[in-house]
Amino acid sequence: MGIFNGIIEFLSNINFEVIAQLTMIAMIGIAGPMIIFLLAVRRGNL
């Protein structure tokens, strides 16, 4: 049972809100260059 308590304690200490916010910022940050790349590849025709 000791290892399970350790895992539960580890998961309860993780701040999932910060992880979600950083994930969203990364997705938004990647979306900009992706749009520019698509515009360049398709010669401006989205």
From Swiss-Prot:
Null allele phenotype: No visible growth effect at 10 umol or 60 umol photons/m(2)/s, loss of the PsbY subunit from PSII, no change in O(2) evolution under medium light, increased susceptibility to photodamage, cytochrome b559 (PsbE and PsbF) is in a low potential state in isolated thylakoids.
Subunit structure: PSII is composed of 1 copy each of membrane proteins PsbA, PsbB, PsbC, PsbD, PsbE, PsbF, PsbH, PsbI, PsbJ, PsbK, PsbL, PsbM, PsbT, PsbX, PsbY, PsbZ, Psb30/Ycf12, peripheral proteins PsbO, CyanoQ (PsbQ), PsbU, PsbV and a large number of cofactors. It forms dimeric complexes. Part of a photosystem II (PSII) assembly intermediate complex PSII-I; crystallized from a strain deleted of psbJ, it forms monomeric PSII before addition of the oxygen evolving complex. PSII-I includes 3 assembly factors not found in mature PSII (Psb27, Psb28 and Psb34).
Cellular component terms per the entry's GO annotation: photosystem II; plasma membrane-derived thylakoid membrane
Superkingdom to which the source organism belongs: Bacteria
Subcellular location: Cellular thylakoid membrane
GO biological process, one term: photosynthesis
Residues carrying N-formylmethionine: M1
Lumenal side: 1-20
Transmembrane segments: 21-38
Note on how the cofactor is bound: PSII binds multiple chlorophylls, carotenoids and specific lipids.
Membrane topology, from the record: Single-pass membrane protein
Protein name in UniProt: Photosystem II reaction center protein Psb30
